[in-house]
């Protein structure tokens, strides 16, 4: 019995440590998938970086010590830049529901939208409780929000999906 308890304790400790040392992309949407991809600022950009689609109600975590997750090798107190968007949940709906970008206009690159999150934090996609379905979706009436949070769940920034000043999503 004692070896089993030791194994369970070790597994629990490993799981707890994994979450505290990773950033996570959380999808709190019930009917949409989300996609986040790390944007490397150093050139040349690495051949492979974090780029994941997360299903509705799921999350995906990545350890920033992994070069794919943190190509700029930012320290624990730094931030990571992402391309982020809300997508249709399945392939058939993708034509009816085009992706909705999340974030703020990138000052370094025209026509690009980025979201910034702590290296040891979270990106959480969620429905906007203040969305008015009677109005056209857009930067002033976003159907979705993307929140950047610290490891202890403090909101750092809230981004609209779509962002202010970026072309609006079609009404579906």
Residue ranges of model-derived segments:
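Intrinsically disordered, low-complexity segments enriched in small/polar residues
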Residues: 18-172
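Bacterial N-terminal signal peptides
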Residues: 6-16
